[in-house]
Amino acid sequence: MLIADQDVQRALARVSQITSSLCELPAVPTLDWLDRAASCIARAADSGVVVIALASADEQGVLSTRDAVGVAASRDRSPAEEAALTSLRSRAHRLQGAALPFRVPSSRDVLLGRMDKLQANWKEGPMGRLWNGHVRGDLICAVAPMSYGPNQAILVCLDATASGVDPAALMAAVMPLLVRFTSECLGPTFDNPRNWLTPREQEVLDQVALGRSVRQIAETLGRSPHTVHDHVKALHRKLGANTRGELIARALGHLARGVSAEHEGLAPREIAEGGLPAPRGGARTLV
């Protein structure tokens, strides 16, 4: 049966776009991972701004944010609007440790709704300090527990304007996938974002995944072999990889952190020849 309702068609198309972009997130933790994730969720509105933050939950489920945030807009912004985004990012970082007006669901459910419905006086608390002067439309927030470890949670806020499709419904549809990818990728280093890959390490990892040697990578990137070697050592340490094969497998999302190729029953030769298990996070991309 054909779907005649244009609103439904638009909603399905938007969910498909967001899902596709989420599947393109790196399979390894990078310093810009949350920014990229925020950019994916921003597609839920024709014009909107997204803030994503990792958070810890106490025994009562009360949230406090950590110094790991991502900020993005759904479209290109003017210089003044870019400055506003920078200000919002700065505020989000300063929010670290503040108790938020949410309680994390005890199961893998998602708490989602418009901010004025979740808490009537939200403007008087930390969320008000974060969004003061930045809200132009409906502020929609979602909170969900991460599956990797206890007391880990993710907070997503979308200031949505000029949207032809209900952005809250779109967020509800894609939040489970975002939570899954965030848990798999950032969960193991939740307490230590310093182990997330820098832009230079991402460049080197891309080259390693192409099968290039240290010398070839140095020539391609215009750096010394010694510098590239240091980056490769850092990649092995940060991603917990013992071999180059494991490093590539982690980069492609075929091997979870803390699991060795031997544990998966794969020999280095099998990795080199493509005998890898299916990616845990779907079709993932290089960083």
Model-derived regions: residue spans:
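Regulatory input/activation interfaces that engage signals or partners
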Residues: 2-13, 17-29, 35-149, 154-163
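Amphipathic alpha-helical "output/dimerization" segments
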Residues: 162-181
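Regulatory hinge/linker segments at domain boundaries
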Residues: 183-203
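Recognition helix of helix-turn-helix DNA-binding domains
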Residues: 193, 211-246
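Short alpha-helical "packing" element that flanks the helix-turn-helix/winged-helix DNA-binding module
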Residues: 201-208, 247
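Short, locally clustered residues in the helix-turn-helix/winged-helix DNA-binding domain
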Residues: 209-210, 252
